[in-house]
């Protein structure tokens, strides 16, 4: 039979294993490579900008570098814009300012956390399989900081395209354009930001027809694989939520069983003590063997004697009356000569 300490140790080990499995089941977030918002950054490709593929839980730092000796400081105001605004390089309507690069003496760092639900009312929230755009319509000078049209978005294609939850190796940009016809805004941006040397409209139609044929060709097609990937990632959120809820329920059950076990053990110990007390009292009430009553049962009760004054005899002490008839212990007293005895002559 295992000791109580060993049982407690085994329960805690099981709980720690379950918590470790729950922790390993959650996706591992990572910090993406920081982006320096400068016209000298070679990552901003002409006609495309910078395209990244973050996942839910990742973090991205956008850095406004400090002024360097011999170079003028670049002033920018960064916006989170809609696809049509990124295509037109316009932030006139409903601008969402993220950060302002206007402090030459220090480096400004703005961190974006890709999360589906933000605890902050003004926090950013992102959805899987959606595209988000960051750009600036400033021209780099202090006078052009508040520009709402053109700027480095148009002259240097300084924009960040964030494809949340998407795999860069799964499908090509052309397949994304044809496989998601409901996202008209995304299609508009992709068409507007194509390089000038892409080819004619006929070539583009031919590519669309090829992609549509691949989508209809069966389970091995790219469109079917994309759908399977979408359903898999959509089910991961529900899976993680179910695992977390299961861990909480398991811990609550362990706590409940522990409290119940302690109560049962306490009640059992109380009953054992009561039975032991009753047995000791019955033993004390049994007469001695040399008094000529060897055949008397141990359960015989000594009846208290009363004096003529209707008082209990002081030589008898009551032990207990909670379990039946009162039991008294006879105190052995030395014989005394009676005080008031009259003899008839």
From Swiss-Prot:
This is Ephrin-B1. Glycans are attached at residue 139. The chain crosses the membrane at residues 237-257. Disulfide bonds join 64-101, 89-153. The modification Phosphoserine is found at residues 280, 286. A motif (Nuclear localization signal) lies at residues 259-272. Cell surface transmembrane ligand for Eph receptors, a family of receptor tyrosine kinases which are crucial for migration, repulsion and adhesion during neuronal, vascular and epithelial development. Binding to Eph receptors residing on adjacent cells leads to contact-dependent bidirectional signaling into neighboring cells. Shows high affinity for the receptor tyrosine kinase EPHB1/ELK. Can also bind EPHB2 and EPHB3. Binds to, and induces the collapse of, commissural axons/growth cones in vitro. May play a role in constraining the orientation of longitudinally projecting axons. It comes from Rattus norvegicus (Rat). It is a single-pass type I membrane protein. Inducible phosphorylation of tyrosine residues in the cytoplasmic domain. CDD domains: Ephrin-B_Ectodomain. Residues 262-293 are annotated as: Interaction with ZHX2. Interacts (via PDZ-binding motif) with GRIP1 and GRIP2 (via PDZ domain 6). Interacts with TLE1. The intracellular domain peptide interacts with ZHX2; the interaction enhances ZHX2 transcriptional repression activity.
């Amino acid at each position: 039979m295992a000791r109580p300490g060993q049982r407690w140790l085994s329960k805690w080990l099981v709980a720690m294993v379950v918590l470790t499995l729950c922790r390993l089941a959650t996706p591992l977030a990572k910090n993406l490579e920081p982006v320096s918002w400068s016209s000298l950054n070679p990552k901003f490709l002409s006609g495309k900008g910078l395209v990244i593929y973050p996942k839910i839980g990742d973090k991205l730092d956008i850095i406004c570098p400090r002024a360097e000796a011999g170079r003028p400081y670049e002033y920018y105001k960064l916006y989170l814009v809609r696809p049509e605004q990124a295509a037109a390089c316009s932030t006139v309507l409903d601008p969402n300012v993220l950060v302002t690069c206007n402090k030459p003496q220090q480096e400004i760092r703005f961190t974006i956390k890709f999360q589906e639900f933000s605890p902050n009312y003004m926090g950013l929230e992102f959805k899987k399989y959606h595209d988000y755009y960051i750009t600036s319509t400033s021209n780099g000078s202090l006078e052009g900081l508040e520009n709402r049209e053109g700027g480095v978005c148009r002259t240097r294609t300084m924009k960040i395209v964030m494809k949340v939850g998407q795999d860069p190796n799964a499908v090509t940009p052309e397949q994304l354009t044809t496989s998601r016809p409901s996202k008209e805004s995304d299609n508009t941006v992709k068409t507007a930001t194509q390089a000038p040397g892409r080819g004619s409209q006929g070539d583009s139609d031919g590519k669309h027809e090829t992609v549509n044929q691949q989508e209809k060709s069966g389970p091995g097609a790219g469109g079917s694989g994309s759908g399977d990937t979408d359903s898999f990632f959509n089910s991961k959120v529900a899976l993680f939520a179910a695992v977390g809820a299961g861990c909480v329920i398991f811990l609550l059950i362990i706590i409940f069983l522990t409290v119940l076990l302690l109560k049962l053990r306490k009640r059992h110990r109380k009953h054992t003590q009561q039975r032991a007390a009753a047995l000791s009292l019955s033993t004390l009430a049994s007469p001695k063997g040399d008094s000529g009553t060897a055949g008397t049962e141990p359960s015989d009760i000594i009846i208290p004697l009363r004096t003529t004054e209707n008082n209990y005899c002081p030589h008898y002490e009551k032990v207990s009356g909670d379990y039946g008839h009162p039991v008294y212990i006879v105190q052995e007293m030395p014989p005394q000569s009676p005080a008031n005895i009259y003899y008839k002559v």
